[in-house]
Amino acid sequence: MRERAVAACDGASKGNPGPAGWAWVVADASENPVRWEAGPLGKATNNIAELTALERLLASTDPDVPLEVRMDSQYAMKAVTTWLPGWKRNGWKTAAGKPVANRELVVRIDELLDGRSVEFRYVPAHQVDGDRLNDFADRAASQAAVVQEAAGSALGSPEPPPAPDVPAARRAPRRGSSGAARKGGGGSSARTIKAKFPGRCLCGRPYAAGEPIAKNDQGWGHPECRTVAAG
């Protein structure tokens, strides 16, 4: 059995549900990306994209090599580590007695995890000086969701493009009060609230519970993305 491999996976959905994609990346000993893959899902939810990314990663790596998987999706991690045993005992029903969502993907992941050493590690998304592998997987998944085409090292694809300058984008609303002037004018509201649950903005970046969000034409997301879309 060889030393542990380090990898990350991520999913993206532009609309939730909307055009979606998945991606995974495996690093070398210095945690530089050396092998990666991304693919389209058509129209799908964030959760389907996240689970698909994990399923593809597990299916594409050697089961005899211990694996560390870095993810920014609490749902996908808890689904296959915390909730899965109870779902199986309950005949694939939740504690509320409802059918488990995305059961086929969860079952497939459970099969791929059987008999292999996998450690899951949660990493916050889109942090300054955050996890490099998570950032790579996030960019690859987002690009796959947008272009709806497969990509990866085996295809000779270039690395996924960098994410937009988030700090600069968040400064944009300070230039004036144009956002407030749009309230009630048929567009998106300028009002912001704190998210009760984590989700993903139309830009493809996730937001955490408690983070300020605003209404846009496709749902809820970052206030700066609402401003950009309105402009």
From Swiss-Prot:
Catalytic activity entry: Endonucleolytic cleavage to 5'-phosphomonoester
Gene Ontology CC: one annotated term: cytoplasm
EC top class named in words: hydrolase
Record's compositionally biased regions (Low complexity): 148-157, 166-181
Superkingdom of the organism of origin: Bacteria
Subcellular location: Cytoplasm
Cofactor: Mg(2+)
Entry keyword set: Cytoplasm, Endonuclease, Hydrolase, Magnesium, Metal-binding, Nuclease
Enzyme Commission designation: 3.1.26.4
Residues that coordinate or bind Mg(2+) 1: 10, 50, 72
GO biological process: RNA catabolic process
One Pfam family matching this protein: RNase_H
Keyword flag Nuclease: yes
Residues of the RNase H type-1 domain: 1-146
GO-annotated molecular function: magnesium ion binding; nucleic acid binding; RNA-DNA hybrid ribonuclease activity
Function: Endonuclease that specifically degrades the RNA of RNA-DNA hybrids.
Subunit structure, as described in the record: Monomer.
Family: Belongs to the RNase H family.
Designated name of the protein: Ribonuclease HI
Lineage: Bacteria, Bacillati, Actinomycetota, Actinomycetes, Kitasatosporales
Gene (name only): rnhA
